[in-house]
């Protein structure tokens, strides 16, 4: 333009056209003034545009920084989501292990229930009281089994629900990761409002995921008694969420204020650009009018030049016309430039209008975010109330479970105590049973000795009967009355001894039958005592003391019996010695004693003594020997009385009859005491087995069974 103006000035200096020079100078002056004004305006617009460009660049940088901050927050939230997911998987694994443990306990309870059911079938033959107790126990176990089944079904449903929730959380995590990758890939090129909307949507999804995770935690902690810790963590997370939401609200309010300020500035800029556009339009109209006037002037000049007399100046006028056309072309190019600038300004105005609409949309979204925040606060309050109610229910269930666990631990402790006491008592019971078995063996040996004595008595009675028959055959007319009385006494004593022997055998058979019956009933009593041992633990020490007293009393009675038997044996020996001396005196004074009878008596005494001496291995055998010698002495005395009845007379017969009566009475008393002692032994053995041996589940019953079998064998 300056070159054009300089050319115009040079041309004005050298121009010869005097008529067009002032108009051209005026035109050039106006053009210079207009161009100066336009230059100043354009420079101001350029400065304003640069300032707005700088502001938009700063806003873009702040938006990028905010987007980076949101991306970092999204990464942190993704990490938190992964940590929560791993924690929930661990909790699910733990609860699955607990469910397996509960299933194992349920199987154990089922096995114990089956055992108790079998025991109940065995004990169905018992009384009504035991049946009622078993029914109550079975009903309690059935209720427990049904309760455990219901709990196992609930735990299985909860486990399936947790697995479904974990799968849903895994899908949500994958979708969030994909969205996060898309945001990272497209976050730089997107506008700021879209990034914020996507970020808000992701936050809402993350918040919903966190709410679902919190609900899962509440449900899981209700089962695992860890609600306190998770409640604290939930409260802390809610506080942090509220604080983060408050901070985000403050940041968004500040951004809204900044956007309002930028919108106001842009509105002012748009208004100023509109005013400038109107001024440019007016200026273009004015230039068009001047151009039309100049065209008219040029046409008039051409007409003047076409007239005659203007030929010399035609070349110069043509040159001036070319210059003017060049100027007009330059002005047209300048006008085109101005139009392009106007179009650019219009485009910028349109972009500013779009930006204003976007700002209004953002403001609307901000209002929606505020409404969503208020709704979230209400939802948080509702969730807090539900959490408090769930915590109250959890506390109640926890208290019930604590009571149940305390009851179970007390029962287990009581069971351990009973097991320890029973295991401690088994050794003492075993010792007592061994002592009882030894005592039974000793008494069986004594019974054998008594049987041997009875056999010897039978032999002696038979021998005496033979002697009496021979004496009667030799002297049928002597002392028929005395011999008849002696024979009757011996027959009666023999019958009594046979009757006693038969009674002993019957008692042995009855004892064997009772032992077999007790063997059959002891197993049932043992199984019933297993169920009743818990109620009888406090009576254990008293029963032990009572049994010890009974045993001590029996030992004292045995010792007294032994001392009494020893005293009687000594008394019998003294009487036997006196009788022997009397018989010797009678034999010396008797002239009718045959030698064959003495030899037979000696031979009859010698087998009795030999049979008695064969059993001299213990004190009982010694007693048998004494009784055998006593009976042989009685036989000698009777033979001596039978042979010397004529010489001695009635005093000797009265002594022998009195002695035989005393001996029969004492033998009957001894047998009765032996029978009573055997009965007391049987009662003691049965009571001991029913009280103690049936309480233990150990294989120590074999000791008693072996003892009873050996006792039966010895009796046989």
From Swiss-Prot:
<comment type="similarity">
    <text>Belongs to the CEP63 family.</text>
</comment>
<dbReference type="GO" id="GO:0005814">
    <property type="term" value="C:centriole"/>
</dbReference>
<dbReference type="GO" id="GO:0007099">
    <property type="term" value="P:centriole replication"/>
</dbReference>
<keyword id="KW-0498">Mitosis</keyword>
<keyword id="KW-0175">Coiled coil</keyword>
<protein>
    <recommendedName>
        <fullName>Centrosomal protein of 63 kDa</fullName>
    </recommendedName>
</protein>
<dbReference type="GO" id="GO:0005813">
    <property type="term" value="C:centrosome"/>
</dbReference>
<dbReference type="GO" id="GO:0000922">
    <property type="term" value="C:spindle pole"/>
</dbReference>
<keyword id="KW-0963">Cytoplasm</keyword>
<dbReference type="GO" id="GO:0000077">
    <property type="term" value="P:DNA damage checkpoint signaling"/>
</dbReference>
<keyword id="KW-0132">Cell division</keyword>
<feature type="compositionally biased region" description="Polar residues">
    <location>
        <begin position="587"/>
        <end position="600"/>
    </location>
</feature>
<feature type="region of interest" description="Disordered">
    <location>
        <begin position="587"/>
        <end position="626"/>
    </location>
</feature>
<comment type="function">
    <text>Required for normal spindle assembly. Plays a key role in mother-centriole-dependent centriole duplication. Plays a role in DNA damage response. Following DNA damage, such as double-strand breaks (DSBs), is removed from centrosomes; this leads to the inactivation of spindle assembly and delay in mitotic progression.</text>
</comment>
<dbReference type="InterPro" id="IPR031470">
    <property type="entry name" value="Cep63/Deup1_N"/>
</dbReference>
<feature type="coiled-coil region">
    <location>
        <begin position="38"/>
        <end position="394"/>
    </location>
</feature>
<dbReference type="Pfam" id="PF17045">
    <property type="entry name" value="CEP63"/>
</dbReference>
<feature type="compositionally biased region" description="Low complexity">
    <location>
        <begin position="601"/>
        <end position="622"/>
    </location>
</feature>
<dbReference type="GO" id="GO:0051301">
    <property type="term" value="P:cell division"/>
</dbReference>
<feature type="coiled-coil region">
    <location>
        <begin position="426"/>
        <end position="590"/>
    </location>
</feature>
<dbReference type="GO" id="GO:0051225">
    <property type="term" value="P:spindle assembly"/>
</dbReference>
<keyword id="KW-0227">DNA damage</keyword>
<dbReference type="GO" id="GO:0005737">
    <property type="term" value="C:cytoplasm"/>
</dbReference>
<keyword id="KW-0206">Cytoskeleton</keyword>
<keyword id="KW-0131">Cell cycle</keyword>
<dbReference type="GO" id="GO:0098535">
    <property type="term" value="P:de novo centriole assembly involved in multi-ciliated epithelial cell differentiation"/>
</dbReference>
<dbReference type="GO" id="GO:0042770">
    <property type="term" value="P:signal transduction in response to DNA damage"/>
</dbReference>
């Amino acid at each position: 333009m300056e070159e054009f103006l300089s050319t115009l000035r040079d041309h004005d200096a050298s121009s010869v056209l005097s008529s067009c020079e002032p108009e051209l100078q005026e035109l050039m002056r106006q053009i210079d003034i207009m161009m100066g004004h336009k230059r100043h305006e354009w420079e101001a617009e350029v400065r304003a545009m640069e300032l707005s460009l700088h502001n938009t660049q700063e806003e873009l940088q702040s938006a990028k920084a905010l987007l980076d901050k949101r991306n970092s927050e999204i990464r942190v939230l993704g990490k938190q989501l992964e940590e929560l997911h791993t924690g929930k998987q661990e909790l699910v694994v733990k609860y699955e292990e607990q469910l397996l443990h509960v299933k194992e306990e349920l199987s154990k309870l089922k096995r114990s229930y089956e055992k108790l059911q079998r025991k109940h079938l065995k004990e169905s033959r018992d009384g009504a009281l035991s049946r009622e107790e078993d029914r109550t126990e079975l009903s309690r176990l059935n209720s427990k089994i049904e309760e455990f089944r219901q709990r196992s079904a609930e735990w299985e449903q909860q486990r399936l629900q947790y697995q479904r929730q974990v799968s849903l959380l895994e899908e949500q995590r994958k979708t969030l990761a994909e969205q996060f990758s898309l945001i990272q890939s497209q976050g730089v090129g997107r506008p700021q409002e879209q990034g914020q909307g996507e970020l808000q949507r992701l936050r809402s999804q993350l918040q919903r995921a966190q709410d679902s995770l919190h609900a899962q935690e509440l449900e899981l902690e209700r089962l695992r008694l860890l609600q306190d810790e998770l409640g604290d963590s939930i409260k802390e997370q809610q506080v942090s969420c509220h604080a983060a939401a408050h901070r985000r609200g403050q940041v968004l309010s500040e951004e809204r204020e900044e956007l309002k300020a930028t919108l106001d500035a842009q509105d002012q800029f748009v208004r100023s650009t509109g005013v400038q556009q109107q001024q440019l339009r007016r200026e273009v109209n004015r230039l068009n009018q001047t151009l039309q006037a100049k065209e008219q002037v040029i046409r008039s000049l051409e007409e003047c030049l076409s007239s005659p007399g203007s030929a010399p100046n035609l070349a110069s006028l043509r040159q001036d016309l070319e210059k003017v056309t060049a100027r007009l072309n330059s002005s047209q190019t300048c006008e085109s430039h101005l139009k392009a600038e106007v179009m650019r300004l219009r485009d910028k105005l349109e972009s500013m209008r779009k930006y204003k609409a976007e700002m209004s949309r953002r403001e609307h979204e901000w209002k929606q975010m505020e409404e969503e925040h208020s709704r979230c606060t209400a939802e948080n309050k509702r969730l807090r109330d539900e959490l408090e109610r769930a915590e109250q229910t959890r506390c109640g269930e926890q208290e019930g479970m604590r009571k149940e666990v305390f009851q179970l631990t007390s029962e287990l402790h009581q069971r351990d105590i009973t097991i320890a006491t029973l295991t401690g008592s088994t050794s003492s019971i075993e010792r007592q049973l061994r002592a009882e078995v030894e005592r039974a063996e000793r008494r069986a040996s004594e019974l054998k000795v008594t049987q041997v004595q009875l056999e010897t008595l039978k032999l002696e009675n038979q021998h005496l009967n033979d002697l009496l028959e021979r004496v009667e055959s030799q002297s049928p007319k002597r002392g028929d009355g005395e011999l008849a009385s002696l024979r009757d006494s011996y027959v009666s004593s023999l019958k009594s001894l046979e009757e006693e022997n038969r009674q002993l055998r019957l008692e042995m058979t009855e004892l064997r039958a009772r032992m077999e019956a007790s063997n059959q009933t002891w197993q049932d009593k043992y199984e019933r005592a297993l169920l009743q041992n818990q109620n009888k633990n406090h009576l254990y020490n008293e029963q032990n003391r009572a049994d010890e007293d009974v045993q001590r009393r029996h030992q004292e009675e045995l010792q007294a019996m032994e001392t009494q038997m020893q005293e009687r044996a000594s008394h019998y020996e003294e009487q036997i010695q006196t009788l022997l001396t009397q018989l010797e005196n009678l034999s010396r004074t008797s002239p009718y004693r045959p030698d064959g009878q003495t030899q037979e008596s000696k031979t009859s005494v010698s087998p009795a003594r030999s049979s008695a001496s064969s059993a001299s291995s213990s004190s009982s055998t010694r007693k048998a020997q004494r009784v055998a010698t006593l009976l042989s002495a009685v036989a000698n005395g009777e033979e001596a009385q039978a042979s010397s009845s004529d010489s001695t007379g009635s005093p000797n017969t009265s002594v022998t009859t009195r002695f035989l009566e005393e001996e029969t009475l004492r033998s009957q008393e001894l047998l009765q005491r032996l029978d009573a002692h055997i009965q007391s032994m049987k009662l003691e053995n049965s009571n001991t087995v029913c009280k103690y041996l049936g309480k233990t589940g150990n294989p120590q019953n074999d000791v008693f069974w072996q003892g009873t079998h050996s006792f039966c064998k010895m009796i046989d």
